[in-house]
Amino acid sequence: MSTEVSPLQSNAYAVNVKTGKRRLIGNKDGMHHVQLSGSGNYVIDNYTSFTIPRNIEIVPTSGKEKTVSLLTATNPMEAYNMPEITVGTLKAADGKTDLYYRLIKPVNFDPNKKYPAVVYVYGGPHAQLIHNNRNYDARGWDIYMAQLGYVMLTVDNRGSDNRGLEFENCTFRQLGTEEMKDQVKGVDFLKSLGYVDNNRIGVHGWSFGGFMTTNLMLTYPELFKVGVAGGLSSTGLTTK
């Protein structure tokens, strides 16, 4: 499995151990979860993307036979009034690293209105909140808040998963510092949007995200109207 196509994806490859050449197996789009057959000749490829609710296919590893479809799911949210969900990049606090963000606009969005905003944060190691999955991994709560009229922003800051060792190791011996700087860049991005009410920006997270919420509120109180910290991590990870 590899993130070669995009850090937001997981794709399967076949590798020739003699030549080192590799070949993509299956659809290029989306997050793929594969199971290899005992013979090694096929994989069951279970995948989703922002535009694909779910496909399950039998894919030959040789690349010479046809793929067989087992399931093509319909969009379960098709009948609902869904918010606009987009993914983009912004620069990290180091001025050079691209960070991925997910932005959800309120349902029935009016660019002439001013909307309150919530930054949903995790920010810790071994986690990534944004993938090329259905709704870019936005949860039901994110969508519910958009239905209530909130702009929702999530940023995968430096120190989070699937971007390589250098990206994750920037927080070594300074956990909670570099992550906050990147989240502040996310707030700066929010404040640059003409439809966001800069006086009504909140922050919320659970576990390491609860730690980040508390830390952000105490370090940058001028940026946030309110913070809601859930399930704070109280281990040596965040207290030393």
Where are the predicted features?
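Short glycine/acidic-enriched loop and turn motifs that connect beta-strands
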Residues: 3-7, 49-52
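Short loop/turn segments that connect beta-strands within beta-propeller blades
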Residues: 16-20, 61-63
